[in-house]
Amino acid sequence: MTKEEKAIIIQEVAQKIAGAATFYITDGSGMTVDQVNKFRKLCFSKGVEYKVVKNSLIKKALQQLNIDHTALNGAALKGASGLMFSDTANVPAKLLKQFHKGGVAKPEFKGASVFADFYVGKDKLDALASIKSKEELIGDIIALLQAPAQRVIGGLTNESRVFAEQA
């Protein structure tokens, strides 16, 4: 790969990192072509972009964005790496867990950046999967706001039935 090609890839990765709220780092080494194709198809269906990138180019892209990536330098940026980009924090984690349920251990979660916070290690995958999306939070808030109104309406409805029965 020439320096010009590397510079283009670094620029692309930097733009994707800057434009996405979340990126995950995975290890897909040892996956068969069929497994990779199935994983990419699943990513596409969930709106997640998956791209295999050399660690040195990921580091340079992060440096270009002035992001302190020292938390990722350990296990996350060693070995083969694939990047997953998403605007919803929990979607890549849920996607990885769903793919693993099919009996495939790879791609393996190595680390993630969620709203500029780093999560490194396999043990963080469950926590990331449990993060609620914006839509889920809005739904919870609406349900909480509707509950008192529904109680009042229910109470008024019961009162009107009692009044109608007495009349």
From Swiss-Prot:
<dbReference type="InterPro" id="IPR002363">
    <property type="entry name" value="Ribosomal_uL10_CS_bac"/>
</dbReference>
<dbReference type="InterPro" id="IPR022973">
    <property type="entry name" value="Ribosomal_uL10_bac"/>
</dbReference>
<dbReference type="GO" id="GO:0003735">
    <property type="term" value="F:structural constituent of ribosome"/>
</dbReference>
<keyword id="KW-0689">Ribosomal protein</keyword>
<protein>
    <recommendedName>
        <fullName>Large ribosomal subunit protein uL10</fullName>
    </recommendedName>
</protein>
<keyword id="KW-0694">RNA-binding</keyword>
<keyword id="KW-0699">rRNA-binding</keyword>
<comment type="function">
    <text>Forms part of the ribosomal stalk, playing a central role in the interaction of the ribosome with GTP-bound translation factors.</text>
</comment>
<dbReference type="InterPro" id="IPR043141">
    <property type="entry name" value="Ribosomal_uL10-like_sf"/>
</dbReference>
<dbReference type="InterPro" id="IPR001790">
    <property type="entry name" value="Ribosomal_uL10"/>
</dbReference>
<comment type="similarity">
    <text>Belongs to the universal ribosomal protein uL10 family.</text>
</comment>
<keyword id="KW-0687">Ribonucleoprotein</keyword>
<dbReference type="GO" id="GO:0015934">
    <property type="term" value="C:large ribosomal subunit"/>
</dbReference>
<dbReference type="GO" id="GO:0006412">
    <property type="term" value="P:translation"/>
</dbReference>
<comment type="subunit">
    <text>Part of the ribosomal stalk of the 50S ribosomal subunit. The N-terminus interacts with L11 and the large rRNA to form the base of the stalk. The C-terminus forms an elongated spine to which L12 dimers bind in a sequential fashion forming a multimeric L10(L12)X complex.</text>
</comment>
<dbReference type="InterPro" id="IPR047865">
    <property type="entry name" value="Ribosomal_uL10_bac_type"/>
</dbReference>
<dbReference type="Pfam" id="PF00466">
    <property type="entry name" value="Ribosomal_L10"/>
</dbReference>
<dbReference type="GO" id="GO:0070180">
    <property type="term" value="F:large ribosomal subunit rRNA binding"/>
</dbReference>
